[in-house]
Structures are given as C-alpha cells and as structure tokens.
C-alpha cells in the first residue's frame, strides 16, 4: 500500500444538524484540538495532530497490553483511539520522539535531555505534571517536530479579506505578475469548479495539502474525499501559466486537556486512571515554509479512594473556508489537520518560537 504523504495540515469546518455519539463539544471562540482524525465536532475551526494518538498507542501497547477500556463505560473517542489509525510508522523517525515509564523526576530529565538533543527543543507541558503526587503511576510522552521550506519561495501578495471578514489578512502565492511559466512547486490535485479544488505545496520530503471546501465531515472523511476526487480528476495536474494561487499566512498556538478521557478507572488494571491527557500545537505557515511543534502527555494515576467522574486560468484562492493537511511524502496518512473559517483565530504573528 502506498504510504501517506509526510506532512498534511487540514483546516475543516465540521458543523452538522445531527451529531453522532462521538461528537466533541466545544466553544465557538477558539480553535478546538481533536484527539483523533475521525472525531466529529460542532466547532467550525479545529485542528488535529498525531501526537496524542502516539501517546495512546504507547500506553495501550506497552502498559495495558491491549485496548484501553473504562470500568464505567468506554466513550466513543476512546474506542476510536484504540483503533490506532495513526502510528509511528506513518512518520519519519527523525520527526518524532516518544517515551514512557514510571512517573519520576528521572524520567522527566530523560525526556528533557532527549528532545533537546534531537530537536533542540524544550517542553511546554512537562512542568504541568505533578511529578511528586503520591498517586502517580506512569507518564507517557510524545513530541512531533517539523520545520521545512517549500521548493518554491512564494511571493507575498496584497492583503485581503477572508471569508467575508471585515479585517484584511496577509497572503502569499502566485498571481498574474509572477506566473509566466509552469510551477512544479505546486501540484494540482483537482479543480472541479471555483468552489471545489485542492493543491499540494511541495517541499523536499513533505507536502502541504490545501482543500477549498465547506464540508462539515471529520478530517478522516475529508482526506478520503480528497484522494477520491484526485483519482477521478482528468484535467491538468500541472500548475501552468495562467493559474493563480493565494494562501493566508497562519499562526496557531493551542493547548488542551481531553477531560472526557480522565478520571475513569481502567479495566484489567490495578485501579489505574488517566489523570491528565494533554496535547499542544505550535503551527506557523508563511511564504517560505512550515514550522510545527506538537507535544502530548498522559499522566496515569492509581486510585487510592473512589474519585469523582468527570479550465482557463484557475484561481486557487484560499481566502474562504478551507482545510489543511500535513504529511510526509512517502507516508500514507497525514500527521496534522486543520479547518480554517475564522482568520481572527489564526492571525499571523511570525515564526513559532
């Protein structure tokens, strides 16, 4: 089977009149982080990155030795995580780090030393763990780091509105002034009409897939939809003279704790439960490339007492609702997905520090 693209960033709008049991509730004033690509959500702006799935996999495979099931009933999102639809094999080894063990200060130092040596990075979440809690059992951790340039350095275009906004935002791309030849830095996946198209910005090992759509489906369904449409498309997949491209600069920094997974006694364990289920993302996209840093951690606790439950020239303009995926070129699945509807939530502030 052909492996997934190396880095995909997807921006999706997932609004629906009817929501399934695995729908994740969210506020409407921020970007929502999702634990799995297949999660449904009421939040228009949302993002998924594969780091939390990696943490879940390590816990299930190396500590639980099987699926993670809760004594008081396993929620749909946990069932989806148990399917392990994203794995380390879908990433290049130099782009991620994972660790697990007893929750000790020695493990914390081991992780800090490892991510500094491998990525020259520090952690934003390890200090959120209470390393001296007497109920500590295990800590599982992962980091994903991507920093790449496109094969084409795109021009900075004039500011304009996004999705009928009042504010004007920065864009990069290719316009009629600088498109006098074919451009192999942009691969056309399909162009069905002025409201339904997708392209892939090329890097050496990764690509950025941009899909113009108003779809409310989950990221997994949308990614499958892209592949189906690309396979059926009979038009030119070369970005040719006369084609134009417009993409917004984006900065996103978010952190979440998946509380729906916390506080439930885990079956077939000695009274273990998830204390915290943390996930972060720092994402930056400009005219030269992508910077992405994401962490995830699960603190596993041991219950001491009962705890509370808790056709002519085509215009590839991404100035309206769109979805972005990041993936490695030789992999079959994306490791990042994002749906963008409200640009106020993604105001470009410069490179992620």
In which residue ranges do the predicted regions lie?
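Positively charged n-region of N-terminal signal peptides that target proteins for export
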Residues: 1-4
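Hydrophobic-core positions in well-structured secondary-structure elements of globular domains
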Residues: 22-353
């Amino acid at each position: 089977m052909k492996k997934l693209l190396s880095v995909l960033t997807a921006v999706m709008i997932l609004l629906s009149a009817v929501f399934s049991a695995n729908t994740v509730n969210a506020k409407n004033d921020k970007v929502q982080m999702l634990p799995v690509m297949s999660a449904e959500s009421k939040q228009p702006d949302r993002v998924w990155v594969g780091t939390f799935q990696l943490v879940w996999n390590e816990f299930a495979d190396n500590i639980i030795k099987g699926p993670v099931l809760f004594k008081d009933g396993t929620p749909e999102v946990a069932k989806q995580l148990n399917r392990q639809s994203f794995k380390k094999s879908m990433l290049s080894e130099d782009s991620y780090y994972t660790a697990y063990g007893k929750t000790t200060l020695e493990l914390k130092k081991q992780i800090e030393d490892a991510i500094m040596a491998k990525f020259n990075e520090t952690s934003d979440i390890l200090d959120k763990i209470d390393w001296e809690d007497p109920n500590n059992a295990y800590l599982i951790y992962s980091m994903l780091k991507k920093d790449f340039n496109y094969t084409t350095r795109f021009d900075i275009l004039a500011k304009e509105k996004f999705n009928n906004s009042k504010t004007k935002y920065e864009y990069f791309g290719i316009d009629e002034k600088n498109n006098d030849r074919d451009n192999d830095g942009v691969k056309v996946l399909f162009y069905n009409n002025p409201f339904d198209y997708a392209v892939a910005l090329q890097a050496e090992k990764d690509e950025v897939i941009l899909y113009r759509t108003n779809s409310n489906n989950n990221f997994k369904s949308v990614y499958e939809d892209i592949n189906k449409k690309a396979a059926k498309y009979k038009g030119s997949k070369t970005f040719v003279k006369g084609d134009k491209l417009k993409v917004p600069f984006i900065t996103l920094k978010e952190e979440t704790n998946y509380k729906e997974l916390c506080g439930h006694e885990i079956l077939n364990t000695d009274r273990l439960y998830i204390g915290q289920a943390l996930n972060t993302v720092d994402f930056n996209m400009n005219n030269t490339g992508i910077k992405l840093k994401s962490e995830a951690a699960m603190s596993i606790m041991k219950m001491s007492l009962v705890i509370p439950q808790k056709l002519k020239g085509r215009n590839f303009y991404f100035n309206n609702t769109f979805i972005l995926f990041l993936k490695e070129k030789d992999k079959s699945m994306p490791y990042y997905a994002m749906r963008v509807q409200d640009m106020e939530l993604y105001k470009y502030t410069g490179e992620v520090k």
